[in-house]
Amino acid sequence: MFSVIGRGIKFSSKSHYSVSCFLIATQGAKIRQIHTHNTFFKNFSFAKLGRNQRTSSLIKIHNSSTSFPKSRSEKVVYTPSLPLSSSVLASFSFLPHNILQNGLNTLHIWSGLPWWASIAACAVAMRIAVFPIMLKMMKTSAKLAIINPKVAEHMSVLSKAKAEGNSELMMQATTQIQNLYKVNNVNPLNLLSAPVFQGILFISFFYALKTMAGVPVEGFTDGGFWWVNDLSQPDPLHIFPVANGLLMLLNIELGSETGSNKVAMSPSMKKFFRFLCLASPLFTMNFPMAIFMYWFPSNVFSVFQGAFLRSSTIRHKLGLPEVPSAMPVPNAQNESFVKSFTDIVHGVQEKGKYPQASEILDATRFLKTDTNNEQKPTNNSTITKATTLSDNSQNDKSSSVTKPTEKKD
């Protein structure tokens, strides 16, 4: 006869009827009753009650307090004289950020927690829910780290076969790599599942919290703590942006997302992520504090998750293989964090000092010289012909000069 949609009740019957709807309060002491008398409703919705009024007394909707529709095409919306807990949630949809907004609002209302604690609890709950996907990704990355030397050998053979144009050797190398993946039960695509899912979750939380802070939702202006009492405004001391960037850097150095710091990462990628973490406060300093109430606990969870998964006994119970201590990357030089950071700083200050930039410049210069040599083949050929002719003429002259004279008897 009716269905609950988002924050309201939608009546779908096409005839006049009488409905009594009872909503039981959280503490079970009092009952809210909505009673209607033989009146057709096309769409009936009511706002959720505020946190302080969730155990209020009996609410009755009478004909005197509600304007009923004159035709079936009209919509009747009854809004009680109670403050809205969130005007953002007035329309429900199945988009990820709207689902998160409704979930956060429900958790805040029925738990009684302040907004900062509700957002942090939701962040931890989401990370626990994503942990099975992360565990699958960690197993795949650990197995790939173990078989990486063999795969690198086959890949070198494959690259040589491509350069030589040997199709048979290429087929053999690819089949050997595929068999190596099948024997070890490894699918490299599993490495993308957790980052993609976490990326979608982070973007959804970011958009949901940014929208709620932009309204702002009731309770956001005083739902924080200490110097960050207003969650709709950025951190005035910029402590959370800096601490969040340092936590991300700590996760990269410890390998928290892979469960082990023994899994090798290319130096260029590590430098890039280090620079991104150190530069992140410049881009996040104007974010509202509601976003950091999700982001900061999520990074703290990652640190504890990495420490939890570095234990050999826990890895054995979870079925995670042990990664060898030394997993070298071919043609890579392991550099310390201080050296890589100083390289980045000198590369920004003085052009050409950054090692990777100098390598790229050398490669481009080499390509330019090759293209210039290829563009002038006729001149080179004429020069070589001229040199050969001159050499031949000089040889003929020398032979004629050095020809021994015959003595007459």
From Swiss-Prot:
Residues 136-188, 257-275 are mitochondrial matrix. It is found in: Mitochondrion inner membrane. One of its GO terms (biological process) is protein insertion into mitochondrial inner membrane from matrix. Keywords: Membrane, Mitochondrion, Mitochondrion inner membrane, Transit peptide, Transmembrane, Transmembrane helix. Residues 374-403 have a biased composition (Polar residues). Residues 97-114, 210-235, 297-409 are mitochondrial intermembrane. It holds the Pfam family 60KD_IMP. Required for the insertion of integral membrane proteins into the mitochondrial inner membrane. Essential for the activity and assembly of cytochrome c oxidase. It is essential for viability while oxa101 is not. When both are deleted the cell is non-viable, suggesting that oxa101 act as a back-up for oxa102. This is Mitochondrial inner membrane protein oxa1-2.
